[in-house]
């Protein structure tokens, strides 16, 4: 067999023509110091702020401090396997999380990885966790109500879709319960809910997940958890991961509710990272950009304009106070960023007023525009009644003789407090809330003993379900009060059947 030189040279030519040389350039640095979840690396000259880097053992890190001759990296995972002299390489990617419908009903960590043991999450899309908030022209003023199902909130401090309402109070005053009840009440309301647990106990998160599952709320909820046992960087990233997952739905024209439970723990985690990165401390040892940490997160809550699809993202951030001190650093920061706050007081909680909302210190700066007309009409005098009652209550303690008007105010106030009490995980539809508050503000409860008010309410709702459906339907569909004469007749008819306890 003869070797044909032309054929061989043609083949070699073809191979040379088809040869593509691809040189992969990757920035590689060396770990020069490691400890407390922070690594310092030398040689990553072109790394971006917030870029993901990969250590030789596969653990990821995030470049936060870009200094003259080294880079400060926070490690997103166990750091015990990393040692001085190890290689660390750039990925060229900014921190991203998976987003999409597949996350609904799942419990994930701040990196979007499932922690509920239900197998992998099939998502095809990711979004960077740091993204700019919608601009002025992309927004619309808040005008649609977000019904929490809690009488004290829907009547006194209403929340609108796209609002940021701070829930503030000491530990164990029922902050998480308010959020869970609000999520449960979003059933059939076309809302996606995201519950972000920051630095909570694993057992607490488990209880929340089971409560949501029991009430069928997990079908439209994503739970993001960075528990107390996880590294500080994950606690710092958790709220951003939650809002990023929510933005995916908001930009598709859907409505989202994000609960951050709680931002004081995120601030503490960020303080820890900053001090370990040797950034200069400020007031209460927090770094100088602690305000920006929360403002850039909460500014991403918005009601989008119709041109942008009309979606909304409502934020319910929590802040834990120490001994009711709302003038501390983090509480005042977050109060100034949000559109109002709901202040929960431990004194009220322990005296049996639950939800323990202090009506005097709680406000909603934009929610009034979102309240339905019927509720606005009936709850107009409620806040003043409560404020007057709290003021007079102190005088009444002295037991001196009080005139008729003062006695009437005290009696109305005591009944108002009773009406605003509510059981746990029992949200009430807005039309029923309007009915009982109408009865209260129009004097129908003035002759009912205070201890019977809760029973009156329960039986009144049952009676309305059977005999007053047309009234409830009218409020539900028109958002207006029904004919006053018909409403009064219905309440009088029920009062005739109600038996006062002896």
Curated annotation (Swiss-Prot):
The keyword Chaperone does not apply. Pfam families: ATP-synt_ab, ATP-synt_ab_C, ATP-synt_ab_N. One of its GO terms (molecular function) is proton-transporting ATP synthase activity, rotational mechanism. Residues 115-138 are annotated as: Disordered. ATP binds at residues 169-176. GO terms for cellular component: plasma membrane; proton-transporting ATP synthase complex. PROSITE patterns: ATPASE_ALPHA_BETA (PS00152). It is a peripheral membrane protein. It is found in: Cell membrane. Belongs to the ATPase alpha/beta chains family. This is ATP synthase subunit alpha. It comes from Geobacillus sp. (strain WCH70).
